[in-house]
């Protein structure tokens, strides 16, 4: 019979020979698919239906394997608790399934067209054609050729029992006095034991109490909380739940309260069974941790229940067990908690298979010794069916299956000892001899300790007991629970431990177990003697079984394995002899698949059956497997109901199977029917390898397995306690990472307990050895290595033992939460795909790179705006022609002449009350008073420089206009801040000395501040040290008032003051670094600023103005001092001090006086937001809230501000950002645009090339949200120009923003710097723009977008300006340009321990340096990879140095702005106060990472909360 009609020849017939006793495919196949239940069917009938189904499960005759266990089990556990189906299938704990993602579609950045293109693999059909007819088909399930009987009574067939609880009742009657369980202490002495009769009696009692007193229904969940030494109480409660018809939920971790609460919540358990001692200990733990008892849970102490006593003539209660038996909770490789449901039928299926395997295990003559010749102290009462010895946890996984369930099923006696007992040399072998152990369950960790102790000191084992010598001849199976077979060690155990201690066939005795601890601990492969090997091997070949081939292994070519190909160089004995050859890997086999299992090797990415000799994921289907996860339907569907595909030879298309499999997550292959496992899918590393062959670049991926890398590290790197290896996906590349635990990372302490400096030289040596050995042995180019102290990496519990969890390590590494002390990078070898610009030397502004962009965008328009001239015309208030006015003084005289009694200024106090009204007449008189006083001073003449140091008051305005009249050059500056005298005083003295200040005009408040003891002494001492002669300080508010007006004083403006080159006003701008910039404005410019502002913002004299903060320059200055005079309206003044005390006062004034247009800084709005005021006024009158900025706008910050203020009544259309700088306070604005700002997504990859390209999604790591700065106002023209070639940029690229406006400053005050002079009167290379342009020094672009002009308004095209940032802050790496703000934003988002606004990125001596203000100074090495990865992933560059400063040492200005210049200067001079410095590439002058002693806390596993990132209160005035 050919089962594969589409395959050539008789491949299927030869490869898969039908099992004897199977039935034709056409007789029962259809019936099987209609009736999936195994109820009321014999094992033979089930087997026949399974074979019949296997021949029809796949389309086109493809083999499908055993009966669909998932169909049955899915039915089983979905029926659990018919009243609780919704609860079982709840979505509340659905996690992401473990699914690998295919890389058929890859998004790449094309350097030619600078675009993001999707390249689709069009060769997929050819790949399928390569698979067709060549795939490796699943291995058939084998049949048990004999009935499984009771080992104690061969007449009793075990198939008559319908559940495991019935078997216990049977044992309690027919093996009543035999010992069931024996518990030993750490020294091997019997601690407690129980017979089958007592075990059954106590279990019946627990079941009776649950039925009578708990109020639970069938299938309700009951939690079991017992410690490992309380195994007997655990078994009693477990079977008590089985008998009572409830579902048991074992919980093994009491120290994790969150896990306990999660399990109780998920399972809705209302009853918990435990012991009295355990309950008291749990109570103490809760009290110590200040936790509350879980709610709605009743706690019972089962050790007080006693036994069950049946009344006379009464019958045992009938067993009415539900489908589910128990739910075992475990953690996935990535640490996710989930419960696996186990049904009673699943238990019986597996027990039958295990019993058959154990029954066929070879027994030897010495195993049939007369028990009278053995010490009766230990052997009396033991079961004659066999003795089971283990130290694994009996409450979970394989320990529960073999040590408890199979013990009951087969009637064994189980002897359990704690894991610590294996560390006592000779004790384990003595226990096996003492109890004549037939079966032994261990793991590698314990067995290695036992075997190596014997190798080091054989006498300790041989002479352990004087009563009898060690003899393991009775041992039939030494089962080892493991993930990989350690070939070298199994030789040691077989030949150097079992054989010397009397075992006659040690290689047959050693049995590796391949279990699924994540899926209930089920066995999927182990050594057996059932037969059926001829159906597993190719062409039905069956090799004779000898002691030599009881251990199967192969020697593989290492290079081929990197490509997922299996190339066998030698097998078995030859493999052992040739294992020392280089470039080979020795891999051991478990055995054939489990008896009733269908096993397939599947490509984890495509889910298609693999070709022969190809590594793939092991998928298995068996009635002995669990049905799925509890309350996780999505994950259950993905993991337990996976369907593989077969490639049709006719259509070359994948055809899904009808059979469902369990995805084990194990990677391996099949050879001659035997299963070889290389590791978990999550533990496989891959790395890209590139080379050039004949001018063509080729790329492949090499795969490496964590177990192989770990073994190499442990063998070759000194001082390594344990380690973990994994890869991370950064910048579209897989980068290997190694985490080491080393005693060298223990923080040393002196005798007095003080911590001493860590030996970083030794740590560097260890990491270097690790990098080099992996490169030499495996060609793995390690990305980074980190070191921490032993027992600090995340661990998972397996068989009661803690093992490093690679995926948990990876997650903690990516979050930067592990306590690492040292990190070493090897990026030069590992990172391959760093982008390079068109001109790697001269950068994006070179002629070559610019020419490429120009050619690419040759069909696009040039970037420049239109120009609309709006000169002075008529004054709206007086209807007077003011086109002939040249100064603000003429408009002031117009107000005095026409509206003398109108109110000019009103001061508002801290309570919102109005001060004295200042009419235009009084305003004129106050100005005249100061003029008259200053005229008497001989040293004050036209053209002299004076400093106006005033608080926010009308006195400042009076002094300003007095200077205008006298032809003085005023420089307004704020008063000295007594908290920052070290910055303010030097800047003030610099101003006096270099600009020859003749006088300093102050008011009373400023004078009081200057006369303060601290300030005056600091000022005088600094002046003496700097050899600066302080000018006169004139308190203008104390001048005697007079009633004469300016006109009566006959004050006339000096004609020289009307010269366009004469600076009527000088604005002082301090950068965050407190570097001073002075820009000069003439009288005509001041008028133009007011005119542009009036026209753009539609301002009239009918609405008042408000001046509050930042009144010394910019928008705040002309709102406070000029616009009121220009419009002829009232100006209200609010002191910044009063605003700071009552932030809501600002909006109360706006609402009360119906102010339509005003301004506010970002610091002002942020201060209001942080204060969270209540009782907001009505803000419907405010139509234009201008927010000046001099760089790029944060889209997220604006969105948060807008959301907050809109919630309190401000119109979303009122937010108007204004782009301004020291050369023009009103370059562009969003005022009255009628459109809500919408971020535009730009592609960062294109931006580095100088191009503007939209990004398709905000989820992309290279997406940059950018807000526009509005439209160009009247009398202003902008152009985007290449800063180097001075050519106009085209649409699609960005350049420097040039501006031509009547509001431009006339010069940098008294500057002779050629660079400063070059910025004025600039012209482009071809003269197209003409003259009169000023270079802003900022990069940006113009773009036409369509917006609606308000609600229900038509859509119009607008030309908007987008500002990217200062050109002086950008730096280039590999010919690509980067904005520090983008990188800093990435860094601050990467880790919660990085302070907000606490990063600075700059380039120094060719290195990219990152300075970070960290919250807390312990284990900073864990943050470094997070920072480097985030920069590499989003910006494709590698930072060369990462330096950390402590809280408060990061230089900031008084407005909490980072001081970039000061940071750079401090770094270059070595004066930056750093805590630790990490050199990513190279080191600084041969030094290692800075010596630093952290506050060590072994329990540190988490980072500070986000709330710890709050900053100090910000000053806004």
Curated annotation (Swiss-Prot):
Region described as Disordered: spans on this chain: 1-26
UniProt GO BP: acetyl-CoA biosynthetic process
Pfam families on file: AMP-binding, AMP-dom_DIP2-like, Mug62
Skewed-composition ranges (Polar residues): 1-13
GO cellular component terms, semicolon-separated: cell division site; membrane; mitotic spindle
TM region(s), chain numbering: 231-251, 397-417, 510-530, 612-632, 720-740, 956-976, 985-1005, 1051-1071, 1114-1134, 1261-1281, 1353-1373, 1408-1428
Subcellular location: Membrane
Keywords: Glycoprotein, Membrane, Transmembrane, Transmembrane helix
Chief location category: membrane
Membrane topology, from the record: Multi-pass membrane protein
InterPro entries: AMP-bd_C, AMP-bd_C_sf, AMP-dep_synth/lig_dom, ANL_N_sf, Dip2-like_dom, Mug62_dom
Domain of life: Eukaryota
Coiled-coil regions listed in the entry: none
Glycosylation-annotated residues: 35, 40, 76, 917, 1178, 1321
MF term (GO), any: catalytic activity
Similarity comment: To S.pombe SpAC22F3.04.
Protein name per Swiss-Prot or TrEMBL: Uncharacterized protein C56F8.02
Source organism of the structure: Schizosaccharomyces pombe (strain 972 / ATCC 24843)
């Amino acid at each position: 019979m050919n089962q594969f009609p589409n395959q050539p020849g008789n491949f299927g017939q030869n490869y898969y020979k039908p099992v004897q006793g199977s039935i034709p495919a056409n007789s029962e196949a259809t019936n099987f698919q209609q009736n999936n239940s195994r109820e009321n069917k014999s094992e033979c009938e089930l087997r026949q239906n399974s074979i019949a189904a296997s021949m029809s499960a796949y389309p086109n005759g493809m083999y499908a394997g055993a009966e669909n266990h998932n169909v049955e089990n899915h039915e089983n556990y979905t029926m659990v608790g018919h009243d609780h189906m919704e609860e079982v299938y709840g979505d509340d704990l659905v996690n992401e399934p473990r699914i690998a993602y295919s890389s058929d579609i890859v998004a790449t950045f094309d350097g030619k067209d600078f675009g993001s293109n999707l390249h689709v693999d069009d060769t997929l059909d050819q790949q399928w054609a390569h698979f067709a007819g060549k795939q490796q088909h699943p291995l058939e399930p084998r049949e048990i050729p004999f009935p499984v009987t009771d080992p104690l009574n061969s007449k009793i067939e075990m198939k008559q029992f319908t559940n495991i609880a019935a078997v216990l009742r049977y044992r309690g009657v027919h093996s009543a006095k035999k010992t069931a369980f024996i518990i030993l202490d750490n020294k091997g002495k019997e601690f407690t034991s129980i017979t089958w009769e007592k075990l059954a009696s106590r279990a019946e009692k627990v079941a009776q109490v649950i039925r009578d007193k708990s109020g639970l229904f069938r299938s309700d969940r009951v939690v079991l909380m017992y410690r490992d030494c309380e195994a007997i109480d655990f078994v009693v409660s477990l079977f008590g739940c089985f008998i009572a018809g409830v579902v048991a939920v074992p919980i093994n971790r009491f120290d994790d309260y969150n896990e306990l609460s999660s399990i109780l919540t998920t399972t809705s358990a209302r009853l918990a069974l435990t012991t009295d001692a355990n309950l008291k200990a749990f109570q103490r733990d809760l009290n110590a941790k200040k936790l509350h008892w879980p709610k709605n849970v009743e706690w019972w102490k089962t050790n007080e229940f006693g036994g069950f006593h049946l009344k006379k003539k009464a019958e045992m209660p009938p067993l009415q067990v539900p489908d589910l038996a128990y739910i075992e909770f475990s953690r996935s490789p990535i640490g996710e908690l989930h419960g696996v449901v186990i049904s009673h039928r699943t238990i019986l299926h597996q027990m039958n298979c295990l019993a058959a395997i154990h029954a066929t295990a070879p027994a030897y003559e010495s195993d049939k010794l007369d028990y009278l010749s053995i010490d009766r102290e230990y052997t009396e009462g033991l079961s004659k069916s066999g003795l089971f010895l283990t130290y694994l946890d009996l409450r979970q996984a394989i320990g529960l299956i073999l040590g408890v369930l199979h013990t009951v099923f087969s009637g064994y006696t189980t002897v359990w000892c704690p894991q610590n007992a294996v560390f006592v040399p000779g004790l384990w072998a003595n226990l096996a001899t003492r109890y004549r152990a037939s079966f032994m369950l261990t793991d590698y960790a314990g067995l290695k300790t036992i075997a190596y102790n014997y190798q080091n000191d054989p006498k300790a084992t041989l002479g352990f007991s004087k009563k009898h010598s060690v003899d393991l001849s009775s041992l039939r199976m030494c089962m080892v629970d493991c993930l990989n077979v350690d070939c070298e060690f199994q030789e040691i155990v077989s030949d150097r431990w079992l054989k010397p201690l009397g075992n006659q066939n040690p290689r047959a005795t050693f049995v590796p177990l391949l279990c699924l601890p994540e899926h209930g601990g089920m066995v999927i492969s182990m050594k057996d003697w059932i037969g059926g090997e001829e159906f597993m091997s190719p062409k039905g070949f069956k090799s004779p079984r000898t002691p030599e081939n009881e251990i199967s292994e192969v020697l593989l070519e290492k290079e081929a394995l990197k490509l997922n190909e299996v190339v066998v160089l030698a097998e078995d004995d030859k493999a052992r002899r040739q294992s020392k050859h280089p470039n080979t890997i020795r891999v051991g086999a478990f055995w054939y698949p489990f008896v009733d299992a269908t096993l397939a090797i599947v490509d984890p990415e495509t889910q298609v059956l693999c070709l022969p000799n190809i590594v793939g994921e092991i998928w298995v289907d068996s009635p002995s497997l669990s049905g799925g996860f509890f309350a996780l339907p999505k994950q259950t569907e993905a993991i337990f109901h996976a369907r593989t595909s077969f490639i049709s030879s006719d259509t070359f298309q994948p055809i899904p199977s009808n059979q469902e499999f369990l995805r084990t997550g194990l990677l391996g292959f099949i050879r001659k029917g035997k299963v070889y496992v290389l590791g978990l899918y999550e533990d496989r590393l891959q790395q890209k390898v590139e080379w050039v062959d004949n001018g063509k670049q080729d790329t492949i991926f090499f795969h490496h397995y964590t177990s192989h890398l770990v073994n190499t590290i442990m063998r070759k790197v000194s001082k390594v306690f344990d380690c973990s290896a994994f890869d991370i996906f950064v910048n579209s590349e897989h980068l290997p990472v190694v985490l080491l635990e080393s005693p060298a990372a223990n923080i040393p302490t002196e005798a007095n307990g003080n911590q001493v400096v860590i030996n970083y030289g030794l740590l560097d040596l260890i990491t270097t050895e690790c990098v080099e050995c992996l490169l030499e042995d495996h060609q793995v180019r390690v990305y980074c290595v980190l070191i921490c102290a032993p027992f600090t990496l995340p661990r998972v519990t397996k068989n009661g033992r803690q093992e490093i969890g690679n995926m948990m390590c990876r997650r903690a590494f990516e979050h930067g939460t592990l306590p690492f002390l040292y990190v070493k990078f090897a990026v030069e070898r590992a990172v391959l795909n760093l982008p390079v610009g068109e001109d790697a030397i001269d950068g994006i502004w070179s002629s070559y790179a610019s020419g490429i962009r120009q050619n690419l965008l040759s069909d696009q328009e040039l970037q420049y705006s239109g120009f609309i001239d709006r000169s002075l015309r008529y004054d709206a208030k007086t209807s007077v022609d003011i086109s002939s006015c040249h100064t603000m003084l003429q408009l002031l005289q117009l107000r005095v002449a026409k509206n003398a009694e109108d109110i000019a200024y009103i001061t508002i106090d801290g309570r919102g009350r109005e001060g004295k009204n200042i009419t235009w007449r009084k305003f004129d008189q106050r100005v005249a008073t100061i003029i008259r006083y200053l005229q008497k001073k001989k040293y004050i003449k036209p053209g002299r420089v004076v400093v106006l140091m005033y608080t926010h008051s009308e006195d400042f305005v009076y002094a300003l206009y007095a200077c205008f009249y006298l032809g003085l050059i005023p420089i307004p500056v704020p008063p000295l801040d007594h908290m920052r005298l070290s910055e303010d005083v030097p800047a003030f003295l610099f101003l006096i000395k270099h600009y020859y200040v003749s006088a300093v005009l102050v008011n009373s408040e400023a004078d009081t501040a200057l006369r303060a003891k601290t300030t005056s002494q600091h000022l005088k001492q600094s002046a003496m040290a700097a050899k600066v002669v302080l000018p006169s300080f004139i308190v203008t508010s104390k001048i005697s008032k007079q009633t004469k007006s300016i006109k009566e004083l006959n004050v006339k403006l000096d004609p020289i003051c009307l010269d366009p080159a004469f600076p009527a006003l000088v604005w002082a701008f301090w950068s965050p670094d407190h570097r001073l910039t002075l820009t000069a404005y003439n009288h005509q410019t001041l008028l133009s600023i007011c005119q542009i502002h009036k026209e753009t913002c539609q301002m009239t004299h009918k609405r008042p103005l408000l001046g509050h903060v930042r009144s010394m320059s910019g928008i705040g200055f002309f709102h406070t001092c000029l616009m009121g005079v220009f419009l002829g309206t009232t100006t209200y003044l609010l002191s910044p001090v009063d605003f700071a005390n009552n932030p809501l006062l600002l909006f109360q004034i706006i609402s009360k006086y119906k102010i339509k247009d005003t301004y506010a800084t970002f610091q002002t709005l942020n201060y209001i937001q942080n204060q969270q005021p209540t009782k907001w006024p009505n803000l419907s009158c405010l139509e234009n809230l201008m927010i000046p900025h001099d760089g790029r706008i944060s889209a997220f910050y604006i969105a948060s501000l807008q959301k907050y203020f809109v919630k309190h009544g401000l119109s979303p259309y009122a937010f108007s950002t204004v782009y301004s700088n020291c050369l023009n306070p009103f370059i562009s604005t969003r005022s009255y645009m009628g459109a809500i700002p919408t971020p535009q997504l730009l592609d960062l990859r294109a931006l580095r090339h100088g191009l503007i390209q939209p990004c398709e999604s905000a989820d992309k790591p290279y997406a940059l949200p950018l807000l526009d700065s509005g439209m160009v106002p009247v009398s202003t023209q902008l152009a985007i120009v290449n800063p180097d070639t001075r050519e106009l940029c085209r649409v699609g690229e960005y350049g420097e923003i040039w501006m031509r406006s009547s509001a431009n400053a006339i010069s940098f005050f008294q500057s002779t710097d050629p660079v400063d002079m070059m910025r004025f009167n600039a012209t482009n290379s071809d003269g197209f723009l003409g003259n009169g342009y000023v270079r802003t020094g900022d990069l940006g672009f113009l773009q036409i977008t369509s917006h609606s002009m308000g609600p229900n308004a038509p859509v119009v095209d607008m030309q908007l300006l987008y500002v990217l940032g200062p050109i002086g802050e950008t730096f280039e790496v590999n010919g690509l340009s980067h904005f520090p703000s983008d990188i800093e934003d990435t860094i601050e988002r990467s880790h919660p321990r990085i302070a907000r606004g606490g990063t600075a990125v700059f380039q120094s001596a060719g290195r990219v340096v990152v300075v970070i203000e960290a919250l807390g100074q312990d284990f900073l090495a864990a943050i470094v990879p997070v920072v480097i990865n985030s920069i590499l992933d989003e910006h494709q560059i590698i930072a060369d140095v990462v330096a950390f400063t402590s809280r408060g040492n990061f230089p900031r200005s008084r407005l909490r702005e980072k001081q970039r210049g000061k940071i750079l200067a401090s770094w270059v001079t070595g004066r930056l106060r750093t805590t630790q410095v990490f050199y990513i590439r190279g080191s600084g002058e041969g030094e290692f990472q800075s010596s630093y002693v952290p506050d060590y806390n072994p329990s540190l596993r988490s980072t500070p909360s986000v709330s710890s990132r709050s900053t100090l209160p910000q000053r806004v005035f």
